[in-house]
Amino acid sequence: MNLDEMTKVGMADLKVGKSPDVLTTLGLGSCVGVAIYDPVTKISGLLHCMLPDSTQFRNNSNKAKYADSGIDELVAQMLKLGASKVRLVAKIAGGAQMFAMNTNNDTLRVGERNVAAVKMKLSELNIRLLSEDCGLNYGRTVEFYSETGEYVIKSVGKPR
């Protein structure tokens, strides 16, 4: 399938779809791509979140920018399409540390914090995390297939 036939999810964005839709997001560095799926209805959602916590910012109107509010919004849109909350499962990718930092300053460890926030929100919503490809120091591009629930991760700059 070529990129023109896929639904593109931008940075700080989310999209929902259903079979046979394919959702894709490019350039996940410290950001996290959160794919949520209902295997019975084949309703899917993909979030490209940039930051862990919307409560730390005054201007937080873009819910998709943050892990906490983005996952809530993604699930809400999927339920409106007919997904069942009890069947939802998730797969995640991203959360890299793209630049070498010799510090213990948590503020600079955005990738790790994003992954932790995503996992916490999924757990809070009782959405089972099936798989993850997170961390390290390379980017990722993902494709999420609504027909099968397959989450294809393409690594960018991954050491061999």
Which positions does each model-derived feature cover?
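Phosphate-centric recognition/catalysis
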Residues: 1, 5-24, 40
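General beta-strand structural signal in soluble alpha/beta enzymes
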Residues: 9, 18, 24, 46, ...
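Short, basic and Ser/Thr-rich N-terminal targeting/leader segments
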Residues: 10, 28-30, 138
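Conserved mixed alpha/beta catalytic, RNA-binding, or beta-rich assembly cores of soluble enzyme
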Residues: 24-81
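Acidic, glycine-rich active-site loops and adjacent beta-strand->loop/helix elements
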Residues: 50-55, 94-98, 135-137
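Short glycine-rich phosphate-binding loop at a beta-alpha junction
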Residues: 86-94
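Phosphate/ribose-phosphate-bearing ligand recognition and processing surfaces
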Residues: 97-111
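Divalent-metal-activated hydrolytic enzyme cores
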Residues: 107-160
